[in-house]
Amino acid sequence: MQTYLLPMKVLAFALMVLATSSFGQRSAPNDGMKIQRLPEAKANKTISLNPEYCVHGEPKAGFKGKLPLLLYLHGAGGVGLDIGKPRRQVGPLLGPLRKASIETLIVAPQATGSPKREKGKGGWQVADLDLLLAHLIETLPVDPDRVYLTGNSMGGYGTFMWAGYRPGHFAAIAPMVGGIGPLGPKDVTKDLDLWGRNLAKLPMRAYYGGKDRVVPADRGAMIMKAIGKAGGKKAELIVFEDKGHDAGRVPYGQPEFFKWLFSHKRKK
């Protein structure tokens, strides 16, 4: 049997065709998510928000009801303009949600900048998130009394921050290994007492790892102290003593966590 060697130029061309063909492309994750985009007029008003965002659980045309909405804020590894990053972060939540028999919309936005590098102007911004939520309620069948917020690491900070300024948006929140300042884990917001008063109004479970060297669990203790000072009795601090910065994987992998979260409705 004879062996034929392709000339390098031909081989390179063949590989390029393969890479750009439907056969050679890496298929989109089979996670049921769709990528949607803010209208340009709204996107132009944002500070540090990718106009694209991930949506899961959108019902078929003709659906007349309302669904709960789970908002997931990614960590620092999700920052940028590659919407696949937050998509991959939120993917592991889908299985436990199914096991908990919870039908919900899930939206995962993307922050485009680092708050530390951009001196507080990057990362999660209240104005951006307010604009996004208003758009979601306008365009998706969202039950505004069943909006839930969670996030990991930088997204845990975003959860504290957004709910700390806008508690009326949410039925319950669950920050994971979240800092409490805009410039990183060692920073503390100047509005800690305000956050405490506002977070005291919400059911909250905040999760940390006892061995976390990135965001130490004492950040959670500080926010709990502020909530307690305001008379709050709905918040819990849960520390997994043997876990590090990956502590959020524990509740995110438990159907019982989602059953707790979705058991709440917004108080009017």
Task: Briefly describe each language-model feature range.
Residues 73-75, 208:
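The conserved beta1-alpha1 loop
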Residues 23-69, 190, 221-225, 235, ...:
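A domain-start/cap signature at the N-terminus of enzymes
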